[in-house]
Amino acid sequence: MPTESSSSEISGGGGGAIPMLRPSRMDQFMNSMAAAAAAVGGGGLPGAADRNGGSGGSDGGSQNGNGDSRNSSASRISAYETQLAYQQHLAGLHGPPPPPPPSHHREISAFVPVLPTGKVRPGSNSNYEIIAMMADKRKELALREAAAAAAMLGRGPGGPGGPGVPPPGVLYGPAGVPPPPYLTGPGPSPTGAGSFPFPPGAAAAALFPPGLGPGMHAGLDRRLLRAPGRASRPKKQFICKFCNRQFTKSYNLLIHERTHTDERPYSCDICGKAFRRQDHLRDHRYIHSKEKPFKCTECGKGFCQSRTLAVHKILHMEESPHKCPVCSRSFNQRSNLKTHLLTHTDHKPYECSSCGKVFRRNCDLRRHALTHAVGEVNSGDYVDVGEEDEARNLSGDEEDSLLEVDSPRQSPVHNLGESGGSGEKSESERMRLKRKAAIDHEESEEEFDDFDEEEELQDLPRVHDLPREEDDDFDPEDEEQAEVALVARFQASKAAATSQSSSSVGTKPERQGVTHCHHEGGETYTMRPHGEKHQEEPGNSGIASLPVPPSFVRYSVPPGAAGPPPAPPGAPPPTHQHPGHPHLLPPNGDPYLPILHVRRDLHHKSLNLSKAGVPPPPHTPPTIITQPESGKPPNQPLHSPHEAMPSFLGSIPMRKRILPAPTLDLMDPHHHPGLGQRTFVDSPSIYALNMSRHPPRQLLGKPPSTETSGATTEKGPPVAAPPIAPPPAPPRRTGFSIEDIMRR
C-alpha cells in the first residue's frame, strides 16, 4: 500500500520518526497477524509475509518510541483485525484470474451495517468508525458467501480426509459435509494447512457470534440469499373484501372476486355463453370447433377441456373411490354416484312441460323433449275427436290408461315385432338386450357430468341419435322401395295374425297401463321396451264393430261383378283415381294425410284388434258414395278412408324402418284376389302406423315407378322384383332399468 511504503521509507531513514496514526495502526495489525501465525506454527499468507518483511525496520523504529501507548489500542481491535484477516482470506480463495461471481459482490443488502460494539475513545479519529463499518459490511458479504457455499455443497472427488476437505467444524459445517465444487479442483488447496492459519481459541470465539457454533452457515442460506426487501413483504397480502380470503397475486384475487359479483366478461361469440376467465373461454371454443386436443394417455380418448380429461382419468383407477352408502356400489366419478343415489329415492326434479313426465336427470328430459319436437302441431291443425269418444262409450278405466308418446310397451313398434314373430322372446334374448342397453347407457352417461354441461349435447354422436340421422339422409328411392316392401310385408303378416288370433282367445291382458319412468309399483326406470304381450279380452268388439262415418258406406257386391257401381250422376269424378284401388280416396278427391295429434285413451281397443276372436267379414271391396254439395266442399273425415282405425295413431313418434322388398306377384290383386280385397283391415296396428305418416303411392293413386305402375294397371307377365332392402333395425331403446344399473 502507498501508506505502508511511505512509512517504511520515513522510518528507514533513521531521522526523527513522525508519529502517524494510520500507518502505525496498519503496522500493528500486520504484526498481530504475524504473531498469531507464529503461535499456531504455520506460515502466514505470502503477501502478508512480504509486507511484514519489508516493513520490519519501521516496526522496530516505531515501537521504540510509543509502543506502550499503541499496544492498548491494538488489544481493543484485535477481534476486528482477526475478522479483517478472515475477509482477506475469503477474497484470496476466489483468486484474481477468474472474476468473482457478481452475486458474491452485491453491495445492496437487506442488512443494515452495525457499528462496532467496543466503546470508542472520545476524540479519536473518524477513520476508526469507517474501518469498522467496512469490516461489518465485509462480514455480511462473507456470511452470504458461506451460505451460498453451503447451499452448493456436493460430494468432492477426495475422501473424508482428503486434501479438498477443510478443517472440520471451522468453515463448512460438520466434518462429514464435503466442500463446494470450486474448492476441489486441481492445484494446491486454498484450505490446506499451509495456506491460512485459522485462529484458535479466543480468535475463533470472536469470529462467530456467541451461542452459535462454527457450523451455523447451513441455517442462514434462506434468510441471506433472499432478494432485498423480500423478507419484509407478507406472503399473502391480497385479501378478498367479501370473504377475507388471502391471495399471493392480484390476478387471483380479481378472479376470485368475480365469484361474488358474478361478473363474466369473456363471452363466446358463437353461443353467447360467458365465463369469468379467459382460459375457460378458450377451452369452451373447442366445443364449437369439434377439436379434442386433450388426449387420454391410457385409452386415447379426446376431450375438449383439460378438467374433463382429469375427471376421465379417474376411470382408469383400479379402485373406485366413490361408494354408495345404501347398496355398497362404487363409482369412479362423483357425478355418477349422485345420479345413482337418486335411484334409491323417488325424487325426479325434471318435469316435461308438454306431457308432465318427470325425470331424474336433465339429460333424460332433453332426450325426451325430442319426441315432442317430432310430433308438434299447430293449434289450427288440432282435430277434436270428442264425439268419437262418446260413440265408443269408453269406461273410466280405459280413460285412465294413458297412451304415452314414448311408452315402448304399448307402442305399435312393439306390436309390429310381435305380429311378425312366432312367439315371445326367449329369456336369453331379453337378457342380451338388457346388457346391450346398459352398455349403451354407459357410453352416453360418460359425457353427462357436472364439470362440462355444454359438452353433453355437442360431443360425439350418441347411440340413441343414430336412427335420427338415418331419417335425415333418407333417399327418395329408398323410401319408394320401403313403401313397396311395406305393403307386401303387411300382406305376408296376415297368416301370422290369423294364427295368433285363435290362441289369444280366452286370455286376459296383464299389467295394462302406461310404462312410466319409475312410478310406484313399476319395474322399469325410463322409456324401456318390455317383452310382454298385451292381448285383448274376448268380449271386446272386433273390426266389424268399428263405427263408420256417414261419408263412407260399405255394401256387398257379388263376386262376379266387374267393379263397384258408378257414382250418382251429379257427383264430380274423383281425381287421381287409381284403377286398381278405387276405394282409397275420400269424397273430395284429395289424399288424406293424418294430423299429428295424440289421443291417450284409445290405445288398448285399437292396437289389438287383430288379436280378437271375431272372424273378419266377407272379402268385398268397399266403395265410396260421394255426397255432392254445391255450396261448400265436403268436410274432412275424422279418420283416413284407407285405415281401419282413426288416424290419431299416426302421431306416435316412429322411425322409418326399411323392410325387405317382396315379389311383385304378392302385390298384384289379379294373381291373389283374396289378398287384394280387404286385407288392410286384418292387421290395423301395422297398417295404421305405417300409412299414417307417409301413405304409399299405391294407396294414394300415384304410381311409385314406371315398372310398378304398369304392373298394377295392366295384366301382363310379372316384372322382376326391386332390390331387397336391408333388414329392419331393432327398436330404439332410450332408457335403462334399475336392474341394469345395479348389474353394472
UniProtKB/Swiss-Prot annotation:
<feature type="modified residue" description="Phosphoserine">
    <location>
        <position position="407"/>
    </location>
</feature>
<keyword id="KW-0863">Zinc-finger</keyword>
<feature type="zinc finger region" description="C2H2-type 3">
    <location>
        <begin position="294"/>
        <end position="316"/>
    </location>
</feature>
<keyword id="KW-0539">Nucleus</keyword>
<dbReference type="InterPro" id="IPR013087">
    <property type="entry name" value="Znf_C2H2_type"/>
</dbReference>
<dbReference type="GO" id="GO:0005634">
    <property type="term" value="C:nucleus"/>
</dbReference>
<feature type="region of interest" description="Disordered">
    <location>
        <begin position="608"/>
        <end position="648"/>
    </location>
</feature>
<keyword id="KW-0562">Pair-rule protein</keyword>
<dbReference type="GO" id="GO:0007366">
    <property type="term" value="P:periodic partitioning by pair rule gene"/>
</dbReference>
<dbReference type="Pfam" id="PF00096">
    <property type="entry name" value="zf-C2H2"/>
</dbReference>
<feature type="compositionally biased region" description="Gly residues">
    <location>
        <begin position="53"/>
        <end position="64"/>
    </location>
</feature>
<feature type="region of interest" description="Disordered">
    <location>
        <begin position="38"/>
        <end position="77"/>
    </location>
</feature>
<feature type="compositionally biased region" description="Basic and acidic residues">
    <location>
        <begin position="508"/>
        <end position="522"/>
    </location>
</feature>
<keyword id="KW-0862">Zinc</keyword>
<feature type="region of interest" description="Disordered">
    <location>
        <begin position="1"/>
        <end position="24"/>
    </location>
</feature>
<dbReference type="GO" id="GO:0000981">
    <property type="term" value="F:DNA-binding transcription factor activity, RNA polymerase II-specific"/>
</dbReference>
<dbReference type="GO" id="GO:0000977">
    <property type="term" value="F:RNA polymerase II transcription regulatory region sequence-specific DNA binding"/>
</dbReference>
<dbReference type="GO" id="GO:0007480">
    <property type="term" value="P:imaginal disc-derived leg morphogenesis"/>
</dbReference>
<feature type="compositionally biased region" description="Low complexity">
    <location>
        <begin position="492"/>
        <end position="504"/>
    </location>
</feature>
<dbReference type="GO" id="GO:0007362">
    <property type="term" value="P:terminal region determination"/>
</dbReference>
<feature type="region of interest" description="Disordered">
    <location>
        <begin position="391"/>
        <end position="593"/>
    </location>
</feature>
<keyword id="KW-0479">Metal-binding</keyword>
<dbReference type="GO" id="GO:0048619">
    <property type="term" value="P:embryonic hindgut morphogenesis"/>
</dbReference>
<feature type="zinc finger region" description="C2H2-type 5">
    <location>
        <begin position="350"/>
        <end position="372"/>
    </location>
</feature>
<dbReference type="GO" id="GO:0016348">
    <property type="term" value="P:imaginal disc-derived leg joint morphogenesis"/>
</dbReference>
<dbReference type="GO" id="GO:0048617">
    <property type="term" value="P:embryonic foregut morphogenesis"/>
</dbReference>
<feature type="compositionally biased region" description="Acidic residues">
    <location>
        <begin position="442"/>
        <end position="458"/>
    </location>
</feature>
<feature type="zinc finger region" description="C2H2-type 4">
    <location>
        <begin position="322"/>
        <end position="344"/>
    </location>
</feature>
<feature type="compositionally biased region" description="Low complexity">
    <location>
        <begin position="1"/>
        <end position="10"/>
    </location>
</feature>
<feature type="compositionally biased region" description="Acidic residues">
    <location>
        <begin position="468"/>
        <end position="482"/>
    </location>
</feature>
<dbReference type="InterPro" id="IPR050717">
    <property type="entry name" value="C2H2-ZF_Transcription_Reg"/>
</dbReference>
<dbReference type="GO" id="GO:0009880">
    <property type="term" value="P:embryonic pattern specification"/>
</dbReference>
<feature type="region of interest" description="Disordered">
    <location>
        <begin position="686"/>
        <end position="744"/>
    </location>
</feature>
<comment type="function">
    <text>Putative transcription factor. Required for leg joint formation, acting downstream of Notch to pattern the leg tarsal segments. Functions in the terminal pathway during embryogenesis, acting downstream of tll in the posterior of the embryo. Acts in a hierarchy downstream of drm and lin during foregut and hindgut patterning and morphogenesis. Involved in cell rearrangement during elongation of the embryonic hindgut. Regulates expression of hindgut patterning genes to establish the small intestine region of the embryonic hindgut.</text>
</comment>
<feature type="compositionally biased region" description="Pro residues">
    <location>
        <begin position="719"/>
        <end position="731"/>
    </location>
</feature>
<keyword id="KW-0677">Repeat</keyword>
<dbReference type="GO" id="GO:0045892">
    <property type="term" value="P:negative regulation of DNA-templated transcription"/>
</dbReference>
<feature type="compositionally biased region" description="Pro residues">
    <location>
        <begin position="561"/>
        <end position="576"/>
    </location>
</feature>
<keyword id="KW-0805">Transcription regulation</keyword>
<dbReference type="GO" id="GO:0000122">
    <property type="term" value="P:negative regulation of transcription by RNA polymerase II"/>
</dbReference>
<dbReference type="GO" id="GO:0045944">
    <property type="term" value="P:positive regulation of transcription by RNA polymerase II"/>
</dbReference>
<feature type="compositionally biased region" description="Acidic residues">
    <location>
        <begin position="391"/>
        <end position="403"/>
    </location>
</feature>
